[in-house]
A protein has these predicted regions:
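Hydrophobic transmembrane alpha-helices
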Residues: 18-20
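Functionally critical loop-and-helix segments that line ligand-binding/catalytic clefts
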Residues: 15
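N-terminal beta1-alpha1 ligand-phosphate binding loop
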Residues: 32, 46, 223
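Short loop-to-alpha-helix "cap/lid" segments that border enzyme active sites
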Residues: 2-7, 89-94, 98-244
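Aromatic/hydrophobic pocket-lining residues that form the small-molecule binding cavity
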Residues: 26, 78, 82, 114
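Short amphipathic alpha-helical segment that frequently serves as the phosphate-/nucleotide-binding helix
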Residues: 24-31, 44
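An active-site metal/cofactor-coordinating segment within enzyme catalytic domains
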Residues: 2-12, 35, 39-40, 45-92, ...
Length: 244
């Protein structure tokens, strides 16, 4: 489960790795994220035609092929499988985002990707260095149903109202809520923590906003710019950061 540092600093979570400086969701992006001081990496997984978890955001590769219809040995060279991605993330925690939304061209109603994720991740990270999330709450429900020890969180992008969202996360037994930055104010952070939830906000690259979220006590900040986020968060404590 994603937990902020003991000194109160939120964790820096590199969005698809150091995605400003390297190609997103690649071994190079994950390695660069650790070099830039990220605590965690967020990455996306989909299932190949032969049931291998591959790390890719979109349903299609750049050449137009559908990930779900492509065998693992035919995916582009830059696309790692999930096991390779875990290895590339070194000592960082990993937030695995499951991509299987209704309406996606590769949507699988049987949620085979969830079973595959649940069967693999525990071999690569202890639960305190792992979070599995999805925009589809039924996907993380399936993960939790397969292995209740795996930390899970719901990614939220729509404006349903704070109480409704947070109460739904609690009712489904998930430990984390991962809202879009534009939904977040201080009262939402307080309300989440009052319910015993962790909050991981995405995707934040503005230094002033990073500092504000840290002031509010969020547990993690997903960012495309881990080096910047690291400087802002650490500088708030030692007095070296000046906004603007």
């Amino acid at each position: 489960m994603i937990v902020g540092r003991p000194d109160g600093r939120p964790l820096v979570v590199a969005h698809r790795g150091a995605s400003v400086d390297r190609r997103e969701n690649t071994v190079e992006a994950f390695e660069e994220a650790e070099t830039q001081g990220a605590d965690w990496v967020e990455l996306d997984v989909r299932l190949s035609a032969d049931g291998v978890l591959v790390v890719h955001h979109d349903a299609h590769f750049d050449d137009g092929r559908l990930v779900r219809e492509t065998p693992a040995d035919e995916v582009p060279d830059y696309v790692p499988n999930l096991a390779e991605a875990f290895e590339a993330c070194g000592g960082m925690g990993v937030n695995v985002e499951v991509k299987n939304l209704p309406g996606d061209p590769d949507h699988d109603v049987s949620d085979q990707v969830c079973a595959a994720v649940a069967g693999l991740v525990a071999a690569y990270r202890p639960t305190d260095e792992l979070l599995i999330s999805s925009f589809d709450i039924s996907a993380v429900d399936r993960i939790r149903g397969t292995d209740p020890t795996l930390p899970t969180g719901w990614l939220v992008v729509e404006r349903h109202g704070t109480d409704l969202v947070l109460d739904r996360v609690v009712a489904h037994g998930h430990g984390s809520v991962n809202p879009w930055d534009e939904l977040v104010d201080e009262s939402m952070v307080v309300a989440a923590h009052q319910r015993g939830l962790r909050m991981v906000v995405w995707t934040v690259d503005d230094p002033g906003r990073i500092s504000q979220l840290a002031d509010w006590g969020v547990d993690g900040i997903i960012t495309n710019r881990p080096e910047l986020a690291r400087r802002v968060i650490d500088g708030r404590l030692d007095g070296t950061w000046v906004d603007g």
